[in-house]
UniProtKB/Swiss-Prot annotation:
This is Large ribosomal subunit protein bL17. Part of the 50S ribosomal subunit. Contacts protein L32. Keywords: Ribonucleoprotein, Ribosomal protein. One of its GO terms (cellular component) is cytosolic large ribosomal subunit. The gene is rplQ.
Length: 142
């Protein structure tokens, strides 16, 4: 029986799982939305919620505690300066998981995990203000 056993193994070693959660947390902080499997998203949610709650304090001890979990300095800066300020009045529930069907190769359940009230432009793939005429005129030139 699995009584009092917290977390999912995700079929990887503990060091791999720790590194994977840290990398996924950096990606989620950077892009504010990522696509992954449903069990990984469910495992990432409490991991990132704790980091955002610590980022709301914005003191040296909280910064060092976050640094022990994730190693990317730019992600830590965004976590404290942007997300900590954005969710200052929210007592929890900073992320949502949206199911997105099944993966083609192995039918693994896929989900998006994203921040609530996220910045739409943070994803980085928003098209520019190029009109169709500009694209057609630049097509022949190199």
């Amino acid at each position: 029986m699995r009584h009092k056993i917290k977390g999912r193994k995700l079929n990887v070693t503990s060091s791999h799982r720790k590194a994977m959660l840290a990398n996924m947390a950096v990606s989620l902080v950077t892009h504010e939305q990522i696509k992954t499997t449903l069990p990984k998203a469910k495992e990432l949610r409490p991991y990132i919620e704790v980091l955002v709650t610590k980022a709301k304090d914005n003191n040296l001890a909280a910064r060092r505690n976050i640094l022990s979990k994730i190693k990317d300095k730019k992600a830590i800066e965004k976590l404290i300066d942007v997300l900590g300020v954005r969710y200052k009045d929210r007592p929890g529930g900073y992320t949502r998981i949206v199911k997105a069907g099944f993966r083609y190769g192995d039918l693994a359940p896929i989900a998006y995990i994203e921040f609530v009230d996220r910045d739409i432009n943070a994803k980085g793939n928003i098209p520019q203000d190029n009109s169709k005429e500009d694209i057609k005129s630049n097509k022949g030139t190199k």
